[in-house]
Amino acid sequence: MTKHELIVWRYIREKQLGVKFKRQVPINRYIVDFFSLEIGLVIEIDGGHHYDPKITKKDKVRTNDLLNWGLTVIRYNNDEVLTNIEGVINSIGEKVDELKERYEIE
């Protein structure tokens, strides 16, 4: 787990946002950074190498596959985590609330 993933993990572990997240979860042929099975939410934290055009293309394929499997995917980059962790966590919390409402989870 990267330093940036650990920062996010501190805020989402132990149902702090109302759902359980697991880290480094295998989904088919991918390993995602964080996943909540309850609401089908994948969270990815992208490092600097994700700006490489080849990696960006692979990320798009990966995201499309996850979406096609019925999951919701949100991505943040390392800079966002370091400079705006409050905004990142608020954004995740809003998505969690939206999906809990969609799936009628209290």
PLM segments and residue spans:
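Nucleic-acid endo/exonuclease domains
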Residues: 1-106
